[in-house]
């Protein structure tokens, strides 16, 4: 799913930086990638998460960059097939967070690229 988002954004002309395995269960792994996101002045962040889906809310709460959340069908128990992940992401109180459908990597990549390309046009004018 993350690779779908990456490929779509690249095909739409974006430079893509990727980081994997930075879930909230080992939250210490998140800080270095977020530091890089801020230093590189990226225009949008795509967060792909399964299980309880908390990663997107955490990221959106820590950065002032639009975050696109992608729930995955990689789930367990009551929330099987990504339903609880989707619901958790939709209920997030973090501002600047948008959510696409379960396993919606293509949609996330397209929206991220539209945001980044639009921001890039204004950056060039400045």
Feature names for model-found ranges:
Residues 1-4, 27-29, 49-58, 79, ...:
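Short glycine/serine/threonine-rich phosphate/pyrophosphate-binding segments
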Residues 22-48, 54, 58-63:
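N-terminal small/polar loop signature for handling phosphorylated ligands or for N-terminal nucleophile
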Residues 10-12, 58-66, 114-117:
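Alpha-helix C-terminal capping segments
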Residues 1-35:
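Glycine-rich phosphate/diphosphate-binding loop of Rossmann-like nucleotide-binding domains
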